[in-house]
Each structure stands twice: as C-alpha cells, then as structure tokens.
Amino acid sequence: MGWLFLKVLFLGVTFLGCLYPLVDFCPSGETRGQKPNFVIILADDMGWGDLGANWAETKDTANLDKMAAEGMRFVDFHAAASTCSPSRASLLTGRLGLRNGVTHNFAVTSVGGLPLNETTLAEVLQQAGYVTGMIGKWHLGHHGPYHPNFRGFDYYFGIPYSHDMGCTDTPGYNHPPCPACPRGDRPSRSLERDCYTDVALPLYENLNIVEQPVNLSSLAHKYAEKAIQFIQHASASGRPFLLYMGLAHMHVPISRTQLSAVLRGRRPYGAGLREMDSLVGQIKDKVDRTAKENTFLWFTGDNGPWAQKCELAGSVGPFTGLWQTHQGGSPAKQTTWEGGHRVPALAYWPGRVPVNVTSTALLSVLDIFPTVVALAGASLPQDRHFDGLDASEVLFGWSQTGHRVLFHPNSGAAGEFGALQTVRLGSYKAFYVSGGAKACDGDVGREQHHDPPLIFNLEDDVAEAVPLDRGSAEYQGVLPKVREILADVLLDIAGDNTSRADYTRHPSVTPCCNPHHVACRCQATGWTDFPTGRC
C-alpha cells in the first residue's frame, strides 16, 4: 500500500470516522427547504424498449410507467458512451472520455480509476453542504483513493464493478452459464472468457468488505433497504442530500430471486425487469413519503442492451440498426448505433417537473452534472470545459431545446476507444467508423471506415437502415457542417484541461477479505445501521 493511499485513508477516516458508517448526518446550518435533494438512479444494460412507457410490448415496468405519467419522459436521451465505466465517468464529471480520461472499462485488478484531478458531482455537492451517498455498481476504480468514499461520497454500499466480474454461490442466469465459487482449496475453472472464477464478488459498505461472495438473490432487497435508510436519515438531518444508485439490473447474471419463483413461466429477463421496477418503486415511495416536494428523481441507463446475451438481453425498441445488422454483428451495447446509447430516461419532481409530458429534446447523461449543480445553487469548476448542458428549462417544461450536437464515442465495437467518430447534428447522424458488437449468434460485424461518412436522417429512419445518397443535395448540405463540428470539438479538447486514466493492472489490488481462501471467501460481518443523527 503506497504512502499516498495511507495519507488519503488517514485523512478520510479522521474526517468521517466519528460516525459509522462514515456519514455525518448532523445539521450544518443548511435546511432541506433551501436546496433540493437529488436521487439519480442508473440502470445497467437496459434497452430503450424495456420501458413500457416507451414500447407497448413491454409489460414489466408498472412503477416506472407510473413515474412517467407523473413526470417527464425523454425519448431522445443518450448515454455518454455505450459501455459501463466511460458512461459512469461522464455522468459524474459532465465530460466525455477524451476529457476525463475514462475511455474503456476498469478491471478487477485495475490499479487506477477515474483520474483524481477530475471533479465529481458528489464533490461539488459535498462542498455545497450536501450529504452524499452512493449505492450499487461503481466501476470507476476501487483501489486506494479511487474508492467512492474518496470521490465525494460520504456513504457507499455496493459492488465496486459489474456483478459478473466475480464468482458467487448463486450464479444466476447468464449466457453462457458460469460456475459457482469454489468451496474447497482448488479453483473452479471455466473455459468461457466471460466467466470470472478466481475471486468471489465482493460487497462493500464504505471501506469494508461485508460479504464475499455476494448473495445475488438478496442484493436488490439490500440495495432498497440501504437506499431507504439513507433517504430517511438524510431527510431527518435537515441537510440536503444526493443519492446516486447504480443498479445491478439489467446486467447479467440475472439473479434467481423469490420474485423469479413467483413469476414461473415468465422469462428470466422479464422477471428481472419486474424486480428492478419494484426496487425503483420502493425508492420513489420513500421519497414521496419523506421529501416529495423537494426531491428531484432522475432515472436513466448507462448504455443499451448486451445483445450477445441472447434471451437475457433487453429490447432496443425501434432502434434496430438495420444497416449494421445486414453487415453482421449487433447494433446495441458497445456500438455507436442508436441501440447502443439511446436509453430510457424519466424525471420526477412534483410541483416542478410537469406531469405526463414527453420531451423530444436531445439530451444526454452528460447533462446530469451541470443540471444538478445548477439546481443545487452550486458552481461548476472553472478550470475545464464540459460537454453537458443545464437542462433545467427542458425539465420544467419551458423549452424543448436540448443539444444541437452530440458526440457518441467509440465503445469497443469499432475504432479506438473513446474516439469521436460518430456525430449527431439535429436529426442527422454521421458515422466515420462502423462495426457490430458480438451478436447472439456469435457473429461480429467487421470494422469499416467511412470518409466521407455514412449519414442517416433519424427523423425518417430511426432504424438506421438506409444512409443518405452521397450525391444528394441533403447529404452535401450536411457534410460540411459535420466536418466543421468535429474539427471544432477536437481542437477544443486539445486545449482543455484533460486527464488520462491509469489502466495498469496488478493482482495485489484485487478486493479480497480472506486471502487464505482460493476465492477470498469470508463470512458476512453483519450489516450496520445508519447513525441516529445525534451530534
């Protein structure tokens, strides 16, 4: 353990250690009525068509559909990348991966994480007097100062990366199936590269591993319980709060829960959707009972469905990427086709966000940072540029204008990680590179470069089936604008205060509560309750 981490650990625990589990709920002069609370819920691998309010074929999201009817639904809302870590880094920084340094996923053995000179949303709100909590999937570094407790979150409860990145005793549904954790002295090996069998999946509460391996069957219940506790105690304290939830749903493995047993005859994915919907419903109910008029709830997703998981993957709705499917491969997660980054999104704030409104504004996960900061009355860092915009006027029904331009970074299917080779301009979308991710049948679409680019008009072709004729007046009118926009953003990034993530790996940073066991197995230490708030 390096001296830097020891110093950060000492300072963090000294500052927070007077109350376990590291949350100071004591009043600090702020009252809840002065500033709004924020609950941001991020689903994992959820398709645009998985939300019933978006797609009539989906019948498993009653609570989310109710939230859509009681708030605002966004139909042209996009993840900042088409894979886990980059999308989450952009949510917390308001910056694309070429600026914040996170262009692809971190591993179990990753030494680094979201670069330390990047300012997170939680850090800005902490400075503004908020109590901050993060529950669920982090996936932005877990070693040393990259842990959520050192990135602005007073409280953390969750898995530090995707819940398929470690073995469990209850593996759940996956494609292909993965083995359970070993119980003896010998590791259980799998020939499948997507199965992690060496180390059990850890569950953290703040800096401590409280369960390894995680019991996936009860994980949703624990997340709901901790979220409800956090909202309760933060509300009682008189301080405004930020709760960021990174759900395990709908990423594989899909757990074999009691709900799954009740819904016999239903597909596992549908049962998982209902469990996720129930979890979100519990959190919304708690908000409604505790701080309804002063809490803004934002629900969205990190990227589109993971098509290679076949029947365990979600629905892209009408965004089928037909041009790419004809070339081979999947046009969903890891790609820059609409199915990879167009995600469900809902906003709920009684009395502030209008009821039962569908917004067509072009918005992004990038906008969460500047919007929340503005609503909190805080200030953006002045030493860097941001790619998100303050969407308050859209949220309050005063405008339908979002981005004119949006960039979709390469996310693994084709091109260099993080590179900006897909550009949205109004209803037009230009591809300088294309490629399909691995599909259910194992097919992968080959990488193709296009200069001049493929350009689609999404107003007439949401399926991205037929690109504009390069000789047409419409194409020739759009092309120079796309080229100018792309050149401008690259020039801006070159002159910006950018970061570079450390992607080196070392087995010594693997989370392990019992190095004497082949899979790091240990008994749960028991759950802690939040402090009473007495000072």
Swiss-Prot record:
Protein origin, superkingdom: Eukaryota
Subcellular localization(s) per the UniProt record: Lysosome
KW Cell membrane (keyword) present: no
Residues that, per the record, bind Ca(2+): 44-45, 84, 302-303
Residues that bear 3-oxoalanine (Cys): 84
Manner of cofactor binding, per the entry note: Binds 1 Ca(2+) ion per subunit.
Cofactor: Ca(2+)
Binding-site residues, substrate: 137, 162, 251
Gene Ontology molecular function: any one: arylsulfatase activity
Glycosylation sites per record: 117, 215, 356, 497
Alphabetized SUPFAM superfamilies for the sequence: Alkaline phosphatase-like
Reaction(s) catalysed (UniProt annotation): an aryl sulfate + H2O = a phenol + sulfate + H(+); Hydrolysis of the 3-sulfate groups of the N-sulfo-D-glucosamine 3-O-sulfate units of heparin
Top enzyme category: hydrolase
EC number: 3.1.6.1, 3.1.6.15
A single cellular component GO annotation: lysosome
A Pfam family reported for this protein in Swiss-Prot or TrEMBL: Sulfatase_C
Mod. after translation: N-glycosylated with both high mannose and complex type sugars. The conversion to 3-oxoalanine (also known as C-formylglycine, FGly), of a serine or cysteine residue in prokaryotes and of a cysteine residue in eukaryotes, is critical for catalytic activity.
Family indicated by similarity: Belongs to the sulfatase family.
Role: Displays arylsulfatase activity with pseudosubstrates at acidic pH, such as p-nitrocatechol sulfate. Catalyzes the hydrolysis of the 3-sulfate groups of the N-sulfo-D-glucosamine 3-O-sulfate units of heparin.
Protein name, entry field: Arylsulfatase G
Organism: Canis lupus familiaris (Dog)
Gene name of the encoded protein: ARSG
